[in-house]
Amino acid sequence: MASKEEILAGLAEIVNEETGLDTAEVQPEKSFTDDLDIDSISMMTIVVNAEDKFGVKIPDEEVKNLKTVQDAVDFIDGAQA
């Protein structure tokens, strides 16, 4: 099971691969849409890659609730349990 720090680092790598953003830009308080400029198509790719990386399922209806990087970290952390 990945720690919250490992989840954050993994998400930063996934966002970097999808968008080219520097991993240092992917901070817990950042909004995926407002701060990181991630559109819905890129977000779905990030979700699929996160599911694969962390062995969790993020239901489509939950994706809209993942507003910030911390929201995603917390969801993945809870889904691992």
Swiss-Prot record:
GO cellular component term of the entry, any: cytosol
PROSITE patterns: CARRIER
UniProt-listed Gene3D superfamilies: ACP-like
Posttranslational mods: 4'-phosphopantetheine is transferred from CoA to a specific serine of apo-ACP by AcpS. This modification is essential for activity because fatty acids are bound in thioester linkage to the sulfhydryl of the prosthetic group.
GO biological process terms held by the UniProt record: lipid A biosynthetic process
Compartmental location: Cytoplasm
Limits of the Carrier domain: 2-80
SUPFAM superfamilies: ACP-like
InterPro entries reported for this sequence: ACP, ACP-like_sf, PP-bd_ACP
Chief location: cytoplasm
Top-rank taxon, per record: Bacteria
Record key words, sorted: Cytoplasm, Fatty acid biosynthesis, Fatty acid metabolism, Lipid biosynthesis, Lipid metabolism, Phosphopantetheine, Phosphoprotein
Modified residues (O-(pantetheine 4'-phosphoryl)serine): S40
Lipid biosynthesis is among the record's keywords: yes
Pathway: Lipid metabolism; fatty acid biosynthesis
A molecular function (GO) term: acyl binding
Free-text function comment from the UniProt entry: Carrier of the growing fatty acid chain in fatty acid biosynthesis.
Family membership noted in the UniProt record: Belongs to the acyl carrier protein (ACP) family.
Descriptive protein name: Acyl carrier protein
